[in-house]
């Protein structure tokens, strides 16, 4: 049987792409290696009676256009905003809480000057976030096209981009450029004097970024994490009722209703090439499937290094993938709790327990964590962000009990000295629990069960090469027209008939649906 399009990988972007193609009348097949759709955006039971978002764990970047076009709310998706964005408990018993209408007063506890500067800082970031929101649903200019008429679309796109940037004054254009090149610490030093305040905001610069907040380029990662929105509120974060898998299931329902076929337990072994063109796939079970368009919703490194033979990949692409930087320093845990944690800095229940709880009191602490991971393999004083989604969603745990997501950094994607993650996973998990215990005594005793995912587990389970949650670092040389490489930023792969729609394409990582949407538009133009 032949298809108009086959999508490799049933993660949320692959499902979005399938839905748009099927709605346009195309015959579409999605192939997912695992037994469940959603890729890293899945909800599973990890301890009897306890369910949680296994890998990706929070909502902000999901594109409103995708939600509206695919009518995801009508397909069961319900997202609730967090009452507070972030909570930063400090070892000395103080704390900072970032929440609508409350952040400035919280900042004033540490610095009146910083509190006065905060509105201008937020307004400035919002200007740049609006730029990113506009770019997120646009195909980057293809800087790899040679001259002549073929270059006209790229030249038009570049001209449009230039005209839009010209609406910003020169100082804002300079500052936007700085955000792509400066470290998060350098950028925050321009605005604030208080270390806890810089830690509260600077944490966004190292989320999924195996780097220090002093690493050049980390300011962009900070910006990447503030351009989202939730239920129409810019910069807000939320929770999908039922976990992140509810997003994938709503998209899958939309795709099925449009006519797409979705298959699980259907791992792709290799691509089929005929006369230099990608024409189909061979599955792990030996089945051969053909299509006019093959769309890869996988890390580009996995695509070009594992699904194609070296001689089938153009030299420039092979070289680029050899240097494609993967590894986000991420160690992921889900824990079942008998009760809510009780923080020394802010005892008792409250909105802070529904926030992102950041256990990393300063930029210097984050810097030491990164340096220690590079030397030791993992930070002995790690960075832990904890979310307790059951405070907003009682479907995840038994009455009176809770689940928590622990997003932990920094850990080396590959351990030094020949050590193996399978031998050290539980030791590092104990360290992460102990880190939370320092801020919330009694936490360790409340843990009823846990799920532990090292970088190697994230790669084996979800295809996240090096455990990289973004399918490749969000560094300046791996963004926009260079994501995944010059000449392929327009969602067309290295060979005719091959397309890309995963997080290794523009606009980068996160549960956005943007890549699936834009890749579908390119495929529809070509078919």
What feature does the model see in each segment?
Residues 2-148, 474, 518:
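N-terminal glycine-rich phosphate/pyrophosphate-binding loop and immediately adjacent elements
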Residues 126-258, 464-478:
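Active-site/ligand-binding neighborhood in enzyme catalytic cores
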Residues 1-5, 23-24, 479-481, 485-486, ...:
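Extreme N-terminal leader/targeting segments of oxidoreductases
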């Amino acid at each position: 049987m032949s298809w108009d399009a086959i999508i490799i990988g049933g993660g949320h972007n692959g499902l979005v792409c399938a839905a748009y193609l099927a709605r346009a009348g195309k015959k579409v097949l999605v192939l997912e290696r695992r037994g469940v759709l959603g890729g890293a955006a899945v909800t599973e039971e990890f301890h009897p009676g306890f369910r949680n978002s296994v890998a990706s764990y929070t909502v902000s970047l999901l594109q409103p256009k995708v939600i509206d076009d695919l009518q995801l709310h009508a397909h069961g998706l319900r997202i609730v905003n967090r009452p507070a964005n972030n909570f930063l408990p400090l070892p000395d018993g103080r704390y900072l809480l970032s929440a609508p209408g409350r952040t400035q007063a919280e900042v004033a506890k540490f610095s009146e000057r910083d509190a006065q500067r905060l509105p201008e800082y937020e307004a400035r970031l919002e200007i740049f976030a609006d730029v990113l929101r506009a770019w997120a649903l646009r195909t980057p200019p293809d800087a790899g096209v040679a001259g002549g008429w073929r270059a006209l679309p790229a030249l038009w796109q570049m001209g449009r981009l230039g005209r839009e940037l010209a609406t910003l004054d020169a100082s804002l254009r300079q500052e936007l450029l700085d955000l792509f090149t400066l470290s998060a610490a350098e950028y925050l030093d321009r605005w604030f004097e208080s270390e806890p305040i810089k830690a509260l905001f600077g944490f966004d610069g190292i989320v999924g970024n195996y780097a220090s907040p002093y690493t050049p380029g980390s300011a962009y990662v900070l910006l990447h994490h503030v351009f989202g929105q939730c239920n129409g509120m810019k910069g807000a974060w939320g929770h999908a009722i039922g976990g992140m898998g509810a997003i994938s299931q709503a998209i899958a329902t939309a795709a099925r209703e449009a006519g797409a076929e979705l298959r699980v337990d259907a791992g792709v072994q290799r691509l089929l090439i005929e006369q230099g063109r990608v024409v189909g796939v061979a599955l792990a079970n030996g089945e051969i499937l053909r299509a006019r368009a093959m769309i890869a919703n996988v890390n580009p490194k996995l695509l070009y290094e594992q699904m194609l033979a070296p001689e089938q990949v153009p030299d420039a692409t092979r070289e680029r993938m050899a240097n494609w930087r993967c590894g986000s320093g991420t160690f992921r845990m889900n824990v079942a709790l008998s009760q809510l944690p009780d923080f020394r800095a802010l005892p008792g229940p409250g909105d802070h327990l529904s926030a992102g709880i950041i256990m990393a009191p300063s930029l210097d602490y984050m810097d030491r964590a990164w340096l220690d991971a590079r030397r030791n393999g993992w930070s002995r004083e790690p960075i832990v962000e904890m979310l307790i989604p059951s405070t907003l969603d009682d479907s995840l745990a038994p009455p009176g009990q809770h689940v928590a997501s622990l997003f932990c950094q920094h850990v080396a994607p590959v351990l030094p000295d020949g050590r193996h993650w399978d031998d050290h996973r539980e030791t590092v998990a104990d360290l992460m629990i102990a880190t939370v215990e320092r801020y919330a005594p009694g936490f360790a005793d409340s843990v009823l069960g846990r799920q532990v995912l090292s970088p190697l587990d994230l790669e084996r389970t979800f295809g996240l090469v090096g455990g990289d949650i973004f399918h490749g670092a969000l560094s300046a040389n791996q963004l926009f027209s260079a994501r995944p490489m010059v000449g392929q930023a327009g969602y067309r792969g290295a060979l005719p008939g091959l397309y890309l729609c995963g997080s290794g394409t523009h606009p980068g990582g996160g549960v956005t649906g943007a890549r699936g949407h834009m890749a579908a538009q390119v495929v529809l133009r070509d078919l």
